[in-house]
From Swiss-Prot:
Family to which the UniProt record says this protein belongs: Belongs to the bacterial ribosomal protein bS16 family.
GO molecular function, one term: structural constituent of ribosome
Transmembrane region(s): none
SUPFAM superfamilies assigned to the protein according to its UniProt record, in alphabetical order: Ribosomal protein S16
Name of the protein: Small ribosomal subunit protein bS16
Gene that this sequence comes from: rpsP
One Pfam family per UniProt: Ribosomal_S16
GO biological process: translation
Taxonomic source organism: Klebsiella pneumoniae subsp. pneumoniae (strain ATCC 700721 / MGH 78578)
Keyword Ribosomal protein appears in the UniProt entry: yes
Keywords (A to Z) from UniProt: Ribonucleoprotein, Ribosomal protein
Keyword Nucleotide-binding: no
């Protein structure tokens, strides 16, 4: 099953997440099909906290991809801000 979820990157105690489309059987930071955005939970100042390609996310959801709870919350916040 294809899912849209977060892959953790960054340094210890400084997480940075990529929003990726991947097979649910792959490891959290493993192989992915497409990168559709990022989320920086510790962004400050002029740094961008979230960037999502909502068109590609809609495409993958239309293809049957499931969305993780956290990514669904990020999408909801992005739609609210736009």
């Amino acid at each position: 099953m294809v899912t849209i979820r977060l892959a953790r990157h960054g340094a210890k105690k400084r997480p940075f997440y990529q929003v990726v489309v991947t097979d649910s059987r792959n490891a959290r930071n493993g192989r992915f099909i497409e990168r559709v955005g990022f989320f920086n939970p510790i962004a400050n100042g002029a740094e961008e906290e979230t960037r999502l390609d909502l068109d590609r996310i809609a495409h993958w959801v239309g293809q049957g991809a499931t969305v993780s709870d956290r990514v669904a919350a990020l999408i909801k916040a992005a739609n609210k801000a736009a």
